Amino acid sequence: MLQRVNPGHKALADYRSIIRRELYGELQELAGRLRGARVLHINATSFGGGVAEILYTLVPLARDAGLEVEWAIMFGAEPFFNVTKRFHNALQGADYELTIEDRAIYEEYNRRTAQALAESGEEWDIVFVHDPQPALVREFSGGLGEGTRWIWRCHIDTSTPNRQVLDYLWPYIADYDAQVYTMREYTPPGVEMPGLTLIPPAIDPLSPKNMALSRDDASYIVSQFGVDVERPFLLQVSRFDPWKDPLGVIDVYRMVKEEVGEVQLVLVGSMAHDDPEGWDYWYKTVNYAGGDPDIFLFSNLTNVGAIEVNAFQSLADVVIQKSIREGFGLVVSEALWKARPVVASRVGGIPMQITAGGGILIDTIPEAAAACAKLLSDPEFAREMGRRGKEHVRANFLTPRLLRDDLRLFAKLLGV
């Protein structure tokens, strides 16, 4: 039997004062049409990374709307996650030679997951599969029946994919009733996608990571980790991964420190069990920091959880997101929701989140350093930028909008 995740309870009514009236009304109308629909989400992990974080909000909100929603974790072990990490990087453009051995490992765990799903005897109206790890579950389960509609959700940028991996996976993905991408620019070239649907992700404004914290509370929490709250600090929150470029962030910090000598740098990362390369890059980042006492590295394994991330984001003088490649970069919306000035790379979904005056988009390390130095030297400019960024997120990147988009797709596929 597949492991089920209990995401707790959330009430859609709690968001009514935060979102637009029209959006709340449409959610009520869609909920009425889809009441009782059975939906199963399948992904690779229940912690670490943006997919799990989204599902911890999306699943209980859909339940509150009247749908019968479950969340299951596919079978996996270290050999499988090593393979899928290589697939993940390859789909984002990394060099990789697809081997018979890697295919066999990948197919074994997808087949085991599909078998458990089929043997459960449960019937589903919608099966919602997230990212490459479980992409073959539909094929190996036989589709579960004529009434089941299958959705494959890609949370990464596959616009310049390794063709071997894409050509291997795509015939299976093409069989899904819908392929959901964050934006058209992420889709792979040269493939047919009759079910293409564009749905950007979103953040939960009421989650522990995003709820309002007083400055005193945030300062107390941050100070417990040794960061001097009386001095400015730059922050990046991301996995320790070459695509997030923590080494480049350290280079930015070192350039800023030449102008603002008291500045500190905090790097916070979530270590997920399906990301074995993360540990290697953690140690690489530690070594690159070179023992600088003003550089701090933390993770969920050093007691930095959602509240602590909230505190760091709420208190940071500048939030950086120096991704080289990015699926969407929800941490940008998280920081903007806290009215923080953000300096971020012009990649992936980040430009969707940063509008004119609501953040600074950069392409190089010197540009990032200059932007950070400007924000540190002009607090009023930084405050106004943070205010504009927050309102853009309120209008476009909160979870009720994501739920609305998913429900629209369900209704279309089920013909209700």
UniProtKB/Swiss-Prot annotation:
UniProt GO molecular function = trehalose synthase activity
User: Which SUPFAM superfamilies does the record cross-reference, listed alphabetically?
Assistant: UDP-Glycosyltransferase/glycogen phosphorylase (SSF53756)
* GO BP annotation list: glucose metabolic process
Cross-referenced Pfam families: Glycos_transf_1 (PF00534), TreT_GT1 (PF21269)
Q: Which UniProt keywords apply?
A: Carbohydrate metabolism, Glucose metabolism, Glycosyltransferase, Magnesium, Transferase
Q: Which reaction does it catalyse?
A: an NDP-alpha-D-glucose + D-glucose = alpha,alpha-trehalose + a ribonucleoside 5'-diphosphate + H(+)
Q: Does the keyword Glycosyltransferase apply?
A: yes
Q: Which cofactor does it need?
A: Mg(2+)
The UniProt pH dependence field says: Optimum pH is 8.0-10.0.
* Activity control summary: Inhibited by 20 mM Fe(3+) and Mn(2+). Partially inhibited by Zn(2+) and Ni(2+). Activity is slightly enhanced by 2 mM Fe (3+), Mn (2+), Ca(2+) or Li(+) and by 20 mM Mg(2+), Ca(2+) or Li(+).
Q: What is its EC number?
A: 2.4.1.245
* EC class of the enzyme, as a word: transferase
Temperature profile: Optimum temperature is 60 degrees Celsius. Active between 20 and 80 degrees Celsius. Half-life at 60 degrees Celsius is 309 hours. Half-life at 70 degrees Celsius is 4.1 hours.
Which PANTHER family is this protein grouped with? SYNTHASE (CCG-9), PUTATIVE (AFU_ORTHOLOGUE AFUA_3G12100)-RELATED
Give the family this protein belongs to, as stated in its UniProt record: Belongs to the glycosyltransferase group 1 family. Glycosyltransferase 4 subfamily.
| UniProt subunit comment | Homodimer.
Q: What does this protein do?
A: Synthesizes trehalose from ADP-glucose and glucose. The reaction is reversible, the equilibrium strongly favors trehalose synthesis.
Q: This protein is called what?
A: Trehalose synthase
Organism expressing this protein natively:
Rubrobacter xylanophilus (strain DSM 9941 / JCM 11954 / NBRC 16129 / PRD-1)
